[in-house]
Amino acid sequence: RYEPRARWIEQEGPEYWERETRRAKGNEQSFRVDLRTALRYYNQSAGGSHTLQWMAGCDVESDGRLLRGYWQFAYDGCDYIALNEDLKTWTAADMAAQITRRKWEQAGAAERDRAYLEGECVEWLRRYLKNGNATLLRTDPPKAHVTHHRRPEGDVTLRCWALGFYPADITLTWQLNGEELTQEMELVETRPAGDGTFQKWASVVVPLGKEQKYTCHVEHEGLPEPLTLRWGKEEPPSSTKTNTVIIAVPVVLGAVVILGAVMAFVMKRRRNTGGKGGDYALAPVSQSSDMSLPDCKV
């Protein structure tokens, strides 16, 4: 059964949770069909573990107009098929996805998906923003610090942490004498912290004794001005020493909805009220993917 995970959505009535529960059960049945179809396309046995991911969502202008829509599928962590920015055509990642693309083109799937993105997706975003305005449109500035790690090679890794920020959009860069170290820098994707905020770090390898020449620069809309940090020039928060744990929360089935650069959150939506999943099956009439995940072999 669907249950609230944020206080602001608890105000939705019983009919909302009943409807979403029915839709989730319909999704489950549809995805079972999709997985069996994918197994057949890739000539795989029914044994073992396989994953089908779906993400749909809309970016909306401040005046409520649709800016960009997403409708994407991935199989076993790899791109499968995605609705393009024109919301009319598809990009298929491999030969199996080409089969799905042809079936969807024949069935007019892109037109139906575009109608959902331009209509229901935008309408629900407006409702969620109205109900959760104080939470969803807030800005939490990052807590930033630099950690120091000796390497067996004799040099040092400096890691710049940004923790507890919202929304997710943030910029971390390392500089040496005012020049950005884009090529030398390791940068992880922004990750959910599990408490409604986000985390990110960027690291650079530097010669021992030269640490003070390197500066980390942090830009976020929650900051009155960008931060500039050096190793040893600030105290890390007591709860986030060198052994800071980054938590990654995978989103398997949801729709990412963003208002400008201000707000991003995940909502689970489907156009249908459940059913057999015909509009979403990979076989006769299905939809899309574009997770841009590495090391995918098909």
Swiss-Prot record:
Cytoplasmic side: 266-298
Stretch list, region Disordered: 277-298
Intervals, Extracellular compartment: 1-244
Record-linked InterPro entries: Ig-like_dom, Ig-like_dom_sf, Ig-like_fold, Ig/MHC_CS, Ig_C1-set, MHC_class-I_related, MHC_I-like_Ag-recog, MHC_I-like_Ag-recog_sf
Residue list for modification Phosphoserine: S289, S292
Membrane-topology descriptor: Single-pass type I membrane protein
Alphabetical UniProt keywords: Disulfide bond, Glycoprotein, Immunity, Membrane, MHC I, Phosphoprotein, Transmembrane, Transmembrane helix
Keyword Metal-binding: no
Additional detail: The antigen encoded by the PAG64 clone, normally expressed only on lymphocyte subsets and thymocytes, is found in increased concentrations in all transformed cells tested, in an embryonic carcinoma cell line, and in pluripotent embryonic cells. Activation of the gene appears to be a general feature of carcinogenesis in the mouse. The PAG64 clone, and related cDNA clones, have in common a repetitive sequence in their 3' transcription units that has characteristics of a transposable element.
Name of protein: H-2 class I histocompatibility antigen, alpha chain
